[in-house]
């Protein structure tokens, strides 16, 4: 594996943050400098965490996932007041979801290792599974290539309900069939049987979406020391009760902090992405097997436009009695993470970085400082046959990342023809229509009754010209079919659906192509934190 770094243009908050623009960096509490990380350690030393209770829970949870010895030792290390975490999180996508989930974990592992060495303190990697999420449409699918098209393959749950991913039971037989259908779209390799067995071993131990995700990730990273946490685990929720109470008692200040920070973002020229109602409480409550967002209504806490209503005392009482019924929204999830873990750094994708820029005053409302927010490592895998296609078309390896592949294709095709087809036909249509306009005027003067027919005649002529243009283009494309197929393969591999590879394709394709140790080989590489995109040549 060889790594090539490419500067890919970014926009908005992410671009300015990575370029060191002071205005947007002022929306975060720490710069990404070594001095800032040292200061973060000092700041964390002044806070108290329920470390022993957390260790007890994480030992039980990670042992259940059959964690390796390195993970168990890292969990135990969390009991020491001089141990800190690098953390990232993601929803529990089936088969681990898009590649960027894997890349987030690799980012966490690398940064934890680097900071442990440079700061001289114990730093452990943690991955937060968003078990409270109830939007199944975001986690119940993957993309495959079928009949020369990219298709979204959805796992249709026979018993769908608005429950969280931690509580949504998987039909193992149905899921197994869905997985087999996905693997049928992959080429049969020497690794296919082993990868299917690897996935099925995790599936057999699972009851829910989060179980399956957790088992698969732990199996994939078993020797890395990675600690997994299910954010909606009932035992973890018990530990979070004091902070849920704090949020409920300060929900107005939390909302005010959010709105004030969003005003700052607007003044800097950015568009806020977090949308909330003015009476938001920022906590979900499970009611009748549904996750319901609570809102304020004249001092009462209501859900579903008043269908459910609780007093402050009733809500606090319910939190103490059934903490597993409560969960965070996009605003309070980062706060809960900060409450639970001694967070040296949070690693996020571009979208997360943008919405965290809206949370600074929310953190301050609770008495927290935002942890250093580090953009995750971005990666694209360049297979040998795709590299050959690029070479055959005389394209640079960076071209698909800096240009629209369709545009590259059009430019290449235009260069194969002396005169561009589009321009020639536009010119011809213009000349013919000018002549026809004059002809229509002549017809109208002699016989006005034929004016409508003359207009239809113009339409028919235009139709025939466009038909000729389409046929010519089709024949030209047929003539260059071999080369154009190379463009299609490049687009499917590197920019599927016009998006980055890591936002569409799933890691199982690469395990099937290169073996179960594929992720281990990627982890052996050292990635830079300079904001550049990493292209790994396979």
UniProtKB/Swiss-Prot annotation:
InterPro entries: Bacillithiol_biosynth_BshC, CC_BshC, Rossmann-like_BshC
Coiled-coil segments: 460-484
EC numbers, comma separated: 6.-.-.-
Disulphide-bonded residues: none
Keywords annotated in UniProt: Coiled coil, Ligase
MF terms (GO), sorted A to Z: ligase activity
Family designation: Belongs to the BshC family.
Function (record text): Involved in bacillithiol (BSH) biosynthesis. May catalyze the last step of the pathway, the addition of cysteine to glucosamine malate (GlcN-Mal) to generate BSH.
Protein name, entry field: Putative cysteine ligase BshC
Organism whose genome encodes this protein: Bacillus cereus (strain ZK / E33L)
Annotated gene: bshC
């Amino acid at each position: 594996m060889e790594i090539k770094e490419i500067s890919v243009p970014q926009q908005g908050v992410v671009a300015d943050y990575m370029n060191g623009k002071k205005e947007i960096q002022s929306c975060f509490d720490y710069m990404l400098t070594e001095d800032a990380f040292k200061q973060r350690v000092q700041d964390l030393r002044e806070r108290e965490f329920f470390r022993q209770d957390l260790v007890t829970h994480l030992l039980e949870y990670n042992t259940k996932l059959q964690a390796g010895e390195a993970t168990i030792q890292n969990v135990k290390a969390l009991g020491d007041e001089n141990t800190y975490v690098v953390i990232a999180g993601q929803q529990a996508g089936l088969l681990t979801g898009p590649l960027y989930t894997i890349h987030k974990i690799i980012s966490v592992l690398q940064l934890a290792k680097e900071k442990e060495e440079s700061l001289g303190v114990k730093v452990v990697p943690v991955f937060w599974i968003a078990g409270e999420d109830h939007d199944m449409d975001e986690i119940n699918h993957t993309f495959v290539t079928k009949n020369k098209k990219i298709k979204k393959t959805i796992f249709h749950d026979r018993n769908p309900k608005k429950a969280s991913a931690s509580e949504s039971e998987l039909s193992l037989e149905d899921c197994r069939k869905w997985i087999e259908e996905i693997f049928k779209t992959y080429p049969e390799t020497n690794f296919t049987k082993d990868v299917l067995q690897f996935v099925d071993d995790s599936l057999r131990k699972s009851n829910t979406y989060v179980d399956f995700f957790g088992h698969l990730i732990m199996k994939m990273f078993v020797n890395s020391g990675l600690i997994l946490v299910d954010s909606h685990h009932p035992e973890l929720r018990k530990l979070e009760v004091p902070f849920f109470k704090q949020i409920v008692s300060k929900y107005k200040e939390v909302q005010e902090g959010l709105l004030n920070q969003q005003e700052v973002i607007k003044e800097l020229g950015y568009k806020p992405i977090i949308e909330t109602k003015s009476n938001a409480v920022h906590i979900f409550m499970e009611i009748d097997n549904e996750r319901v967002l609570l809102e304020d209504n004249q001092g009462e806490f209501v859900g579903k436009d008043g269908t459910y209503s609780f007093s402050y005392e009733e809500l606090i009482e319910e939190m103490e009695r059934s903490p597993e019924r409560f969960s965070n929204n996009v605003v309070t999830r980062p706060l809960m993470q900060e409450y639970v873990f001694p967070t040296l750094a949070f690693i996020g994708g571009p979208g997360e970085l943008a919405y965290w820029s809206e949370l600074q005053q929310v953190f301050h409302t609770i008495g927290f400082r935002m942890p250093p927010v580090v953009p995750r490592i971005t990666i694209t895998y360049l297979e040998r046959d795709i590299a050959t296609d690029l070479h055959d078309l005389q394209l640079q390896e960076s071209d698909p990342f800096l240009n629209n592949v369709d545009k590259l294709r059009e430019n290449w095709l235009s260069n194969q023809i002396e005169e561009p087809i589009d321009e020639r036909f536009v010119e011809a249509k213009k000349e013919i229509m000018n002549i026809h306009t004059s002809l229509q005027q002549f017809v109208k003067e002699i016989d006005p009754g034929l004016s409508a027919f003359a207009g239809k005649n113009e339409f028919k002529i235009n139709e025939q010209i466009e038909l000729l243009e389409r046929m010519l283009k089709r024949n030209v494309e047929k003539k260059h079919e071999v080369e154009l197929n190379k463009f299609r393969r490049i687009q499917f591999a590197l920019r599927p659906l016009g998006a980055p590879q890591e936002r569409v394709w799933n890691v199982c394709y690469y395990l099937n192509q290169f073996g179960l140790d594929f992720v281990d080989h990627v982890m052996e590489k050292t990635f830079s934190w300079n904001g550049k995109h990493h292209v790994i040549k396979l």
